[in-house]
């Protein structure tokens, strides 16, 4: 709460999950899937203790997804379907989740780097016109991640469900000209795992199975440190084989797929995506920065988002960065490699890093009125109020 007794809400709308709660808290109050579903056929009115409605959102939609036509309002971190997005926000602020009177609250929202201006304008418009929040602030996700880590300068590798961003931040300001985006993230890895399991003879082709495979991925997948070695183990031994019990009681065996699926992050061609993988993209981003800032960036690489949770990811990133630095900067001179300092921070709570940073920032700002865009300012200026965030509005 701020000094006037208004609640300060923090809402991190991801492509896959919504994380929402209050300023100053150290964990989201609610985490639920960012999906909206509509029944395919209305034959029953109840499944278990869930009532089937014309519009199902979040947890309920996820549980009944086999009976629904499901839509994710966000794609690659950007809102694609505003009507469904409003349903998602109604659910977030309504009695099912936060249960707040939006007119007497302030809200801090997060946005991906390189978010189109139109997208940001529309979000502010909806927050003031539909929900009538008293104050709104929009923060860039990568900057919040660094705040949560207690840093002002660093490179954030943020990989969620819909998109992966590599975003350098200097003295608290994100550098859009250096920000890179890779359209491979959690959802693509899950799809690829479905494909790999199909080759093993397990068919997961229904949208309801998607959730099951996501759970298999979270439980069993890891990033291989040395791919040749992993492939040898997968082919010649059964060391990697793990059993997994499906919701219907069947047991499946998963082997080499455990490291093959996340490998798409490093080798996008595996899932027919052009371009370089996450390690090379990170290297290119840092090398494109001003020469004086590079060493700071190499020493403060921060991982964030659910798709950076794979065991083995930090060490593989470090290995590839060292290799690239040796080949392209030192031209193979191994002697000089010992001077190359690199540090990859993988905080244990990185899945909710953006929310945590948002909760910290909102708490610091709660009584500083000059930071927030207010409803009154919006009524006077319209979307030009965004200039207050230091954003140029065309």
From Swiss-Prot:
The family annotation for this protein states: Belongs to the actin family. ARP2 subfamily.
GO-annotated molecular function: actin binding; ATP binding; cytoskeletal protein binding; structural constituent of cytoskeleton
User: Which residues of the sequence carry a binding annotation for ATP?
Assistant: 160-162, 214-218, 305-310
Q: What does this protein do?
A: ATP-binding component of the Arp2/3 complex, a multiprotein complex that mediates actin polymerization upon stimulation by nucleation-promoting factor (NPF). The Arp2/3 complex mediates the formation of branched actin networks in the cytoplasm, providing the force for cell motility. Seems to contact the pointed end of the daughter actin filament. In addition to its role in the cytoplasmic cytoskeleton, the Arp2/3 complex also promotes actin polymerization in the nucleus, thereby regulating gene transcription and repair of damaged DNA.
Give the SMART domains listed for this entry. ACTIN (SM00268)
Q: Which species expresses this protein natively?
A: Rattus norvegicus (Rat)
> Record's InterPro entries?
Actin (IPR004000), Actin/actin-like_CS (IPR020902), ATPase_NBD (IPR043129)
List where the protein spans the membrane: none
Q: What's an example Gene Ontology biological process for this entry?
A: associative learning
Q: Which GO terms describe its cellular component?
A: actin cap; Arp2/3 protein complex; cell cortex; cytoplasm; cytosol; lamellipodium; nucleus; podosome core
Q: Where in the cell is it found?
A: Cytoplasm, Cytoskeleton; Cell projection; Nucleus
Superkingdom: Eukaryota
Which key words tag this protein in UniProt? Acetylation, Actin-binding, ATP-binding, Cell projection, Cytoplasm, Cytoskeleton, Nucleotide-binding, Nucleus
- Where N6-acetyllysine occurs, the residues are 299, 322
Gene3D superfamilies attached here? 3.30.420.40, Actin, Chain A, domain 4
Which Pfam families would you find in this protein's record? Actin (PF00022)
N-acetylmethionine, modified sites: 1
Q: How does it assemble?
A: Component of the Arp2/3 complex composed of ACTR2/ARP2, ACTR3/ARP3, ARPC1B/p41-ARC, ARPC2/p34-ARC, ARPC3/p21-ARC, ARPC4/p20-ARC and ARPC5/p16-ARC.
The protein here is known as Actin-related protein 2
């Amino acid at each position: 709460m701020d000094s006037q007794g208004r609640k300060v809400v923090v809402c991190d709308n991801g492509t896959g999950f919504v994380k929402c709660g209050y300023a100053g808290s150290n964990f989201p109050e609610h985490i639920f899937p960012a999906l909206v579903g509509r029944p395919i056929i209305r034959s029953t009115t109840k499944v278990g203790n869930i009532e089937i409605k014309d519009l199902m959102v979040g947890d309920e939609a996820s549980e009944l997804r086999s009976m629904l036509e499901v839509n994710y309002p966000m794609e690659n971190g950007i809102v694609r379907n505003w009507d469904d997005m409003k349903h998602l926000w109604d659910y977030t602020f309504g009695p099912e989740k936060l249960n707040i009177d939006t007119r007497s609250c302030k809200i801090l929202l997060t946005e991906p780097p390189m978010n189109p201006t139109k997208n940001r304008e529309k979000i502010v418009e909806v927050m003031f016109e539909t929900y009538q929040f008293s104050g709104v602030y929009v923060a860039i996700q990568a900057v919040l991640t660094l705040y949560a880590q207690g840093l002002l300068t660093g490179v954030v590798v943020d990989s969620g469900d819909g998109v992966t961003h590599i975003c350098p931040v200097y003295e608290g300001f994100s550098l859009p000209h250096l920000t890179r985006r890779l359209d491979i993230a959690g959802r693509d890895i899950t799809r690829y795992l479905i494909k790999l399991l199909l080759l093993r003879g397990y068919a997961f082709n229904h949208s309801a199975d998607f959730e099951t495979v996501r759970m298999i991925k979270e439980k069993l997948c890891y990033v291989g440190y040395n791919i040749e070695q992993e492939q040898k183990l997968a082919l010649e031994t059964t060391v990697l084989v793990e059993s997994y019990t499906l919701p219907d009681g069947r047991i499946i065996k998963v082997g080499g797929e455990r490291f093959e699926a996340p490998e798409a992050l490093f080798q996008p061609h595996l899932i027919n995506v052009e371009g370089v993988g996450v390690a090379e993209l990170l290297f290119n981003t840092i090398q494109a920065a001003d020469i004086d800032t590079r060493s700071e960036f190499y020493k403060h690489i921060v991982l964030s988002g659910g798709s950076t949770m794979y065991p083995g990811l930090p060490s593989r990133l470090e290995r590839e960065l060292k290799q690239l630095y040796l080949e392209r900067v030192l031209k193979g001179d191994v002697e000089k490699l010992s001077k190359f300092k690199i540090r990859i921070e993988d905080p244990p709570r990185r899945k909710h890093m953006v929310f945590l940073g948002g909760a910290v920032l909102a708490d610091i700002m709660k009584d500083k009125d000059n930071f927030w865009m207010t409803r009154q300012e919006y009524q006077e200026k319209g979307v030009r109020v965004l200039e207050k965030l230091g954003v140029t509005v065309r």
